Amino acid sequence: MLAVHTSPLAQPGIGDAGGMNVYVLQSALHLARRGIEVEIFTRATASADPPIVWVAPGVLVRNVVAGPFEGLDKYDLPTQLCAFAAGVLRAEAAHEPGYYDIVHSHYWLSGQVGWLARDRWAVPLVHTAHTLAAVKNAALADGDAAEPPLRSVGEQQVVDEADRMIVNTDDEARQLISIHRADPAKIDVAHPGVDLDMFRPGDRRAARAALGLPLDGNVVAFVGRIQPLKAPDIVLRAAAKLPQVRIVVAGGPSGSGLASPDGLVRLADELGITARVTFLPPQSRTNLATVFQAADLVAVPSYSESFGLVAVEAQACGTPVVAAAVGGLPVAVRDGVTGTLVFGHNVGHWADAVDQLLRLSAGPQARAISRAAVVHAAQFSWDNTTDALLASYRRAIGDFTATRQHRVRDLVATRKPRRWISRRGMGA
């Protein structure tokens, strides 16, 4: 696997680390449990990063030195793709030919390197975009920076070259087809999974006590990177209209605009709700489950979201979700059953949606909503994701092998007989 711009070992909620990190790591771990050896190549971001990290039996992370360890923005990473690709190719060269059977690249930067590796190693390239520039640019938040044309060009190249594409939802498949003219026959859907052993219902009062929150009252949680794309400000602005609501924000800075906790702290002060907002740093997976268990509902107001893993993890804990009706969130959340979908980012509409869902969650329907959320989340197990990944890999290998054999047959059929000409003065 290739994950250039962010390590699967990074703490989600910090910098560029988020759902993709969880996806790469968990899919690798579950593939290894099926007997598939997985090596993940990522860019080293600190001098202390060891070249090799054994995460679990069958899962190896290779930290490739490509560019400076610090101060390199994600938008500058295209300048380091040559260095990263060199590190990947050198690692393969240390093995016997044919060591790798398939390349699975994540995000367009990795796809550029995967394209080269595919051609050098003669193995199929499977690519997961995770997000698309055109989709993000069509729904920019105030203060967010547009994705550069370079990315759109790079994404198109990867789509053209990939042997198969794996997407999170049918909606993402339609986007690939309409925006990048992807071949529908080469697209497979594999919903991201959730760790159902870790994310499960728990005692709400105990969870609140563990986080130092008041045991009574309504709590709405926002979990994710603090950036305009994720729209944490919408949650605070909605809370300003709901005096009975306490907000928990768990995440670290990323992106531009309102991209720092300090920015949200100032916004809370301006709105006069500082006493009702608790800011937490990015949480470990175990602590994240505690946050979900402590909340009456979880808000996911993103402007674009290819899936929305946080929404599924929250529901696995029995907590309903109010989410923006964008991207994969209508798949992650069953509107009117496990939560509420909100169209647009009008603060008044969000305040109404939060208020109504809180009332339902506190009424006679509370148990039914919680149970429905758990049942819905159960279909997004990592075992199901792994089944879908393996099916896609098999198709990729089968199609790639058949194509190569067909090309060899065509080459043999069209090759002209070779004529051997003896030159005067040469021995027999």
UniProtKB/Swiss-Prot annotation:
Transmembrane residue ranges: none
A single MF term (Gene Ontology): D-inositol-3-phosphate glycosyltransferase activity
Recorded superkingdom: Bacteria
Keywords: Glycosyltransferase, Magnesium, Metal-binding, Transferase
InterPro entries tied to this protein: Glyco_trans_1, Glyco_trans_4-like_N, Mycothiol_biosynthesis_MshA
Record-listed Mg(2+) binding positions: F292, Q293, A295, T319
SUPFAM superfamilies for this protein: UDP-Glycosyltransferase/glycogen phosphorylase
Keyword field contains GTP-binding: no
E.C. number(s) listed in UniProt: 2.4.1.250
Positions that bind 1D-myo-inositol 3-phosphate: H5, D16, A17, G18, G19, M20, N21, K74, Y107, T131, R151
Biological process annotations from GO: mycothiol biosynthetic process
Catalytic function, reaction form: 1D-myo-inositol 3-phosphate + UDP-N-acetyl-alpha-D-glucosamine = 1D-myo-inositol 2-acetamido-2-deoxy-alpha-D-glucopyranoside 3-phosphate + UDP + H(+)
Amino acids binding UDP-N-acetyl-alpha-D-glucosamine: Q11, P12, G19, R225, K230, Q283, E305, E313
Similarity remark: Belongs to the glycosyltransferase group 1 family. MshA subfamily.
NCBIfam families listed in its UniProt record: mycothiol_MshA
Record's function text: Catalyzes the transfer of a N-acetyl-glucosamine moiety to 1D-myo-inositol 3-phosphate to produce 1D-myo-inositol 2-acetamido-2-deoxy-glucopyranoside 3-phosphate in the mycothiol biosynthesis pathway.
Self-association state and partner proteins as the record states: Homodimer.
Protein name: D-inositol 3-phosphate glycosyltransferase
Native species: Mycobacterium leprae (strain TN)
Name of the coding gene: mshA
